[in-house]
Amino acid sequence: MNQLRLALLATMLAAAACSQPPVATTHSVTIMTFNVENLFDNIDDPGKDDRDYLPLSQKQDPEHKAACAAVEVESWRNRCLNIDWTDAIIAKKLEVIAQAILQVDGGRGPDIIALQEVENIAILERLRTEYLAAANYLPGVLIEGRDTRGIDVAFLTRLPLAGEPQLHDIVFDESFNAREGDTRGILQTDFQLPDGSVLSGFSVHFPAPYHPTEMRIAAYRTLNRLLVELPEDRPVFAAGDFNTTSMEDSARDMLNRFVRPDWTVSNDLCVGCQGSSYYAADDTWSFLDMILWRPCCGEDATWQVRADSVQIANGTKAQMLPGGTPRRFSLPDGNGVSDHWPVVLTIESK
């Protein structure tokens, strides 16, 4: 009798299980963009103008002083002559960058980080292995570009790569040839999402605001051409320092013309956020740093931005001045982190 009852119970449980709909598996991926402001080692890279970021002991020869004296901007000239970029200062810089990254996702850090102003793969790998070891990031992605100072765009990721990264030069008008040495390419990297599909990402650092607006327009157009070349059924993001100030956007309608027609813009979803960068000279905030999102397939998209997930990651003590603005990394004390705050968003499968 007991065996009969057990058999009936097993049959009923099996039938009940079959009648229940399968439980949906939801995956999420957190993306950060972070301009880490001059993350240099203190070794002179051949072919790059990185003389600012050397120890003071290596800045005493006449050749170095003569090169610095030729710099027209006084603050840049003083930086070239007087910054003492020691091992201890580099260690402090790496430490505070890591703290800013690890404040996200309960100390794990984001799954993907688009980085700007990284000198080379060596300093990126030092950040990853010595200061972000707990985050379990894979070897960094950085391809040396044409910026004469040597600052590059890069990625750190826990997601496996789904192809060979590529660095795309921005196509400028010939009238800007003399300025190309102060520009960075667009780094494309494809990632394998948890459900096995491919996510394409671009890490960008557009021409600085002191360059003509037309150079940033050229950068947006290059990015959008790269977007069109990707499969329509692939989710895509672009993250970085777009260097479009709030004043320029207001005057030239930059985001409405070159971004919103194709992308969802992170700052449109960041409730109550003033910006990621502050310019004290005219007391203005800007979202220089953005994450742009292009889901695939319209309403049938399997990956979407999670509601209310966009945030400014500025919660570490070192990141903020008493007045509530970004605290750039300053010498000689090594206070601050960067003149940019990281922007974070989460995408999830449905």
Tell where the protein language model's regions lie, with residue ranges:
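Bacterial N-terminal signal peptides
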Residues: 7-16
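N-terminal, active-site-proximal structural segment of metallo-dependent hydrolase catalytic domains
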Residues: 18-130, 141-146, 151, 319-321, ...
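Metal-dependent phosphoester-hydrolase catalytic domains
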Residues: 19-23, 30, 225-237, 244-350
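Active-site beta-strand/loop signature of hydrolases that rely on acidic residues for catalysis
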Residues: 31-36, 80-86, 90, 101-124, ...
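Short, solvent-exposed loop/turn and secondary-structure capping segments
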Residues: 42-47, 125-129, 152, 166-169, ...
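Extracytoplasmic, non-cytosolic globular domains
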Residues: 48-50, 113, 131, 140-144, ...
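Short helix-loop capping/hinge motifs at secondary-structure junctions, enriched
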Residues: 81, 160-165, 297-301
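Structured beta-strand-rich core segments of catalytic domains in phosphoester-bond hydrolases
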Residues: 112-198
